[in-house]
């Protein structure tokens, strides 16, 4: 059995387990069964507080600053401030000359960005610092996305595929083939990488 076959079996097993558990719970409590139980689609920036990834794609770094949007004076944002997290005005809050505000307590400020230092779960594993995340090819990312799309989720999987200019043709052919053969492709965000240009 190849790695992809093992991965597909693993994802399918978890999809079945999740569906059976949710349906059993709904049936026991007289609740209508949902039409989607397996999702990879965080809803809003506050879901990121739980450590959820913003989609089914590899992070761009092992450690980074995650900015989460809150309305000004939101109780959770104020709690973050009390715990020492940095708060900056939203990118949409500007002065009369169109310049970004720099004081989150300015009366013109309507939203806050709470800056939370974040690291991926595997950041401190031996050898993790030698993984160059930006070297994943577009086809590797697409394959990773399609495995989850085909064998786990019951709708569109939220994913961003970063590609380089020389990968456009092979990626577009792979997408076209998946659509033509009914393999479950719905959509993915495509982002041109400017790192190697």
What is each of the regions a protein language model found here?
Residues 35, 48-49:
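Short capping micro-motif at the N-terminus of alpha-helices
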Residues 1-41:
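Internal maturation/activation junctions in enzymes
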């Amino acid at each position: 059995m190849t790695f992809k076959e093992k991965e597909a079996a693993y994802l399918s097993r978890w999809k079945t387990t999740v569906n059976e558990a949710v349906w059993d719970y709904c049936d026991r409590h007289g609740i209508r069964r949902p039409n989607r139980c397996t999702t990879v689609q965080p809803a809003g920036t506050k879901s990121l507080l739980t450590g959820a990834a913003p989609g089914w794609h590899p992070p761009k770094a092992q450690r980074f600053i995650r900015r989460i949007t809150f309305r000004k004076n939101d109780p959770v944002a104020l709690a973050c401030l009390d715990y020492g997290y940095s708060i900056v005005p939203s990118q949409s809050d500007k002065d009369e000359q169109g310049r970004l505000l720099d004081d989150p307590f300015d009366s013109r400020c309507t939203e806050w960005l709470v800056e939370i230092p974040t690291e991926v779960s595997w950041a401190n594993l031996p050898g993790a610092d030698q993984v160059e995340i930006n070297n994943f090819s577009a086809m590797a990312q697409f394959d990773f996305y399609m495995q989850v799309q085909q064998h786990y989720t019951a709708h569109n999987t939220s994913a961003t595929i970063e590609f380089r200019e020389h990968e456009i043709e092979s990626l577009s052919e792979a997408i076209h083939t998946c659509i033509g053969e009914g393999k479950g492709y719905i959509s993915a965000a495509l982002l041109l990488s400017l790192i190697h240009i």
